[in-house]
Amino acid sequence: MHNKVVHTVARACQEHGMPTLRFNYRGVGASAGSYDEGRGEIQDTLAVVAAGKARWPAAALTLAGFSFGGMVSLLAAAVAAPARLISVAPAVTRAEFASIARPAAAWLIVQGEADEIIRCAEVQAFAARFQPPPRLVVLPGAGHFFHGRLPELRDAAFEFLASS
């Protein structure tokens, strides 16, 4: 929740007047429970979506996630049906993605070209599987945590939100 990448995307949403909720998955930080291979984390995401819809019923839902959270938010999108989806350096090599359908949402993927954890080529191949393909923004030289590149990440998210 306090990750600088997550904070940067949340700030872009807030600059568009969108309410935001950031949270830790089970077993992270002060959250109860333990890691559940993505299954429980999808349920965590859907619980937060339900709370957000109850608090802001008129707001269009945007899901965003970074790395493992990028995978979880994409899988949760099948149930939550967001208007927009932002996936930052999503963990696309997970088996859960082998047969996933493209979400109906407007979809942005932001990937660092020099990501040392999630290979850029894997994300590009993943994005190319879908029709229509998601909007893919590759930041040259950016690593997994976008050190020194957060303004460009923010700009990509901000521009996507302005156009979708």
Q: Predicted regions: what is each one?
A:
Residues Q43-A105:
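Primarily recognizes the serine-hydrolase "nucleophile elbow" in alpha/beta-hydrolase
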Residues Y25-G29, V92, G143:
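Alpha/beta-hydrolase active-site loop signature
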Residues P103-Q111, D115:
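Short beta-strand/loop motif that positions the catalytic acidic residue
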Residues H147-F160:
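Post-His helix in hydrolase/transferase enzymes
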Residues M1-A58:
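Serine-hydrolase catalytic machinery in alpha/beta-hydrolase-like enzymes
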Residues E113-I118, F145:
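Acidic catalytic loop of the alpha/beta-hydrolase fold
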Residues R119-A128:
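Short alpha-helix in the alpha/beta-hydrolase fold that links the catalytic acid
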Residues R129-F145:
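Catalytic histidine neighborhood in serine/cysteine hydrolases
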